[in-house]
C-alpha cells in the first residue's frame, strides 16, 4: 500500500492566460523592417539579408545561389560606375493582340524594376572593355520576346563593330508565348548576329544561370566560345516530365543540371558566383588581341 502511495502521480493545475495583440502598445511591438531576413530555398536557414548581399546572394550555410536581378549582377561583375546601358527604354509590343499582355508587362516592370527581360550595355571588367547582356528572370521569367531579341542583337552588332568581347548571362524560361512566332524568330536573329561576331574572331562567353531553358538554350546560350555556369543551374530545352513522357524512360536525378552537363562536356566550367569576375578577367586576359 505504501509503495502505491509513493508511486502515485501528482498533477498541478495552471490557469490559462489569453494573450492578444491589444495587450501590447504599438510602441512596444517589435519593429522588423520588411526584407530584413531571407529564407534559403534549399536549406531553409533564416539569413540576415545584408549579410546575404555581402556574400554575393549565396547562402553561407549550403552554398545555394539565390536569384539575382540584372542590375545586381552587373554591379558584382563590372568595375564601379563603368556600365553604360543600351536601349534602356525599348519595350516589347503586342503583335498578336494577346489579351492582357500590355497590363502584364507593366505589372512586371513595377515588380522587377527593369523595363524588359534583358539589360544590355558596355562596361569595364578589370579595366577591359566588354559588351554585356544580362537576362533577368524577375521579368516574365526572362522569357525572350521581340524586345529581348532586338536588344541582344543590337548589343552583339555593337560588339562586332567595335571589336569587343561579348558576355551574355542567360536566365530564361524560353520563348515568350504571348508573341508567338515573332518570339521564336529571335532565336535565329540572335544566332546570326553571334555568327557574324565570331567570324571576326571575337570572344563570346556565355554564363548559364538558373534556370536556362527553352529557346534560349536551343540558341545563343550554348553557342559561346567558352560556356560557364553557376552551380546547380537547371539547363535544358523541354521539361523533365515532357521528356520522360516522350521516351517512356526515367531520367537520372541530376539530369538537366550544370553538373550533369559539365560531366558530358556541354559546358566548360562551373564557377562560384564570388569567383566569376576573377575567372572572366583571366579569360579576357588570355584572349586579348591588339587589333591596331
Swiss-Prot record:
Pathway annotation from the record: Lipid metabolism; malonyl-CoA biosynthesis; malonyl-CoA from acetyl-CoA: step 1/1
EC number: 2.1.3.15
Reactions listed under catalytic activity: N(6)-carboxybiotinyl-L-lysyl-[protein] + acetyl-CoA = N(6)-biotinyl-L-lysyl-[protein] + malonyl-CoA
Chief localisation class: cytoplasm
UniProt cofactor note: Binds 1 zinc ion per subunit.
Zinc finger (C4-type): 40-62
Pfam family membership, one: Zn_ribbon_ACC
Cofactor: Zn(2+)
Keywords: ATP-binding, Cytoplasm, Fatty acid biosynthesis, Fatty acid metabolism, Lipid biosynthesis, Lipid metabolism, Metal-binding, Nucleotide-binding, Transferase, Zinc, Zinc-finger
Entry binding sites for Zn(2+): 40, 43, 59, 62
SUPFAM superfamilies: ClpP/crotonase
Domain CoA carboxyltransferase N-terminal: 36-292
Keyword Lipid biosynthesis (UniProt): yes
GO molecular function: acetyl-CoA carboxylase activity; ATP binding; carboxyl- or carbamoyltransferase activity; zinc ion binding
Location within or outside the cell: Cytoplasm
Superkingdom, taxonomy of origin: Bacteria
A single BP term in Gene Ontology: fatty acid biosynthetic process
Gene Ontology annotations for the cellular component aspect, listed alphabetically: acetyl-CoA carboxylase complex
Assembly mode: Acetyl-CoA carboxylase is a heterohexamer composed of biotin carboxyl carrier protein (AccB), biotin carboxylase (AccC) and two subunits each of ACCase subunit alpha (AccA) and ACCase subunit beta (AccD).
Family designation: Belongs to the AccD/PCCB family.
PANTHER family registered for this protein in UniProt: ACETYL-COENZYME A CARBOXYLASE CARBOXYL TRANSFERASE SUBUNIT BETA, CHLOROPLASTIC
Reported function: Component of the acetyl coenzyme A carboxylase (ACC) complex. Biotin carboxylase (BC) catalyzes the carboxylation of biotin on its carrier protein (BCCP) and then the CO(2) group is transferred by the transcarboxylase to acetyl-CoA to form malonyl-CoA.
NCBIfam families xref list: accD
Protein name: Acetyl-coenzyme A carboxylase carboxyl transferase subunit beta
Organism, as annotated: Clostridium perfringens (strain ATCC 13124 / DSM 756 / JCM 1290 / NCIMB 6125 / NCTC 8237 / Type A)
Gene (name only): accD
